[in-house]
Amino acid sequence: MKRTQYKPRITPITRIGKAGFISIREIRVIRGFILLGFLVLACLGCNSPAVNTVATKSGIDMVVIPAGSFEMGSKSGRPDEKPVHTVWVDAFLMDKTEMTQAVWELIGKAEALPNPSHFKGAALPVEQVTWPQAARFCNARSRFEGLKPCYNEDTAECDFEADGYRLPTEAEWEYACRAGSATDYSFGSDGRKLGDVAWFVDNAAKKTHPVGQKKANAWGLFDMHGNVAEWCNDVYDKEYYQTSADKNPRGPADGKENVLRGGSWKSSADAARSAYRLGETPGFSDACLARDAIGFRCVRKKI
């Protein structure tokens, strides 16, 4: 009698009573859910574009901020943060960090711009900067890099079509700070986590700190919360949001104060919120002002 080789028969697993066996159909369903889960995780960052940086001749990298719309202001914030309104912002470039003393001194040598800072250090943010000084530095940096300056230093008017450096508009600043978020801070609304991204009154030990030590926001920008408050190009008006343009707003036509954003090493967690606004005279006429807590960062139009 001829022997045949035994070949075991493989059959699909089926559910047997309460033993918990799983059928082929159920395996396929589970596999589908797993695949869907991976796709969902992959898409969680769809609204947070990959960080695209641009090197500059002056040494501070810039981040390409994508065009888009966002909800500006805060429903639960101070009166000058209301009403919340939808704003469209064109793409632009923003310094990855606050302006450092090293770069200020590099460019300032040829422009008679001495370092005004109270706390000294190459990697520290420059501070004790008036608005006119910040605008003048933007022009100096533009010339240093062969770009067209934006500011008329006699009138403080800004040429937004020039390809040089300028201060961000208030809308650009908040849009970049939020980095796609709609919460109190770029990372959420839990102020207890602010120390992960910011130097503020609770952790700064009464001084500024080297830029870029804390976590960046989703768009790769450092110290948008805390360290030093940052000048914006706009004139401050506590009621401006009631009449603000909905596309690339550039602030009121005139006023006695300019906008500061972001809070500082002296600020509370509340003052470091993304929507928090502060108006200050551009030349530091207020004797009570914390001057060593004010700096800036530059932006450029995206070409």
What are the roles of these predicted feature ranges?
Residues 242-252:
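Short, surface-exposed loop/helix-turn segments at secondary-structure junctions
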Residues 1-50:
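Intrinsic disorder/low-complexity segments
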Residues 72-91, 208-214, 270-289:
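Short, polar loop/linker segments at the starts of domains and inter-domain junctions
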Residues 69-74, 87-188, 196, 233-241, ...:
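Active-site microenvironments of metalloenzymes and redox enzymes
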Residues 47-50, 215-217, 252-303:
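Disulfide-stabilized, aromatic/cysteine-rich ligand-recognition loop
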Residues 157-160, 198-225, 252:
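Short, well-ordered junction/capping motifs at the entry into regular secondary structure
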Residues 51-66, 162-165:
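GGW-centered surface loops in extracellular recognition modules
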